[in-house]
């Protein structure tokens, strides 16, 4: 009997490890929330908030998982496409940028929505609309910034730690066996070779050219190619500086942007709406819908990258990111 009990104890542990109970609610579909106003037409406000990536956030105890910004925009734009009352779209941006591809995909989705839906799209930069955030803003017909907003930071960045010296100090040595000379390209365990640095710079230059092309194509009336090149050294601009340099179309408050969009539509009344997950969310035009993908602490670029939220897998992360 004693032997049987000893046998059952590890068996129970094995069976327990096979049982998984989810105590976080499932992600619910987006629901429309009226922020303000009245009337038949709707002006939809969508938030691009925090670092732009393909990574969402798993739910904790009693909280829903949160899709990535890319997934959120796709879901929201599909929902808006089928609503015949949507008369205009405002992308409210508060982002330092993020992944190159994630930024480009959101830009593409908004551009495709605008062409198919045939409604005006405004980008409103609330606090920060830098690098990838500014890239996404190029999908809009008009870019407006809050008087105290920061924008710009046109460029590409890629970073790594070189920990070879640290490993040597603690007596740890890494060995790599590879099929080709560049298989461990950009490894943190050794300094990069001149050839590798040149290869990486070539990739960055190509992605930078893409950024320049997108801005050039969408800011034809405000910027010449030579003017844009002079501004595209990675620096940020205040709203006033951005307006003077042709990077934005207007410096105004959000209420003014909404009024301006109504005027362009030839209407005086409209419901301003957003899409959010069901919650105790109390809506105003300044409320961020409760589906943030990054916490306040994670909004600074380096923390997000090295905490794994932007680049969860090994490799080089190419970023359209303002990273002070």
Q: Where is each model-derived feature located?
A:
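N-terminal organellar transit peptides
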Residues: 2-9, 13-129, 140-146, 158-324
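Short gly/pro/ser/thr-enriched loop/turn and capping motifs at secondary-structure boundaries
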Residues: 130-131, 150-154
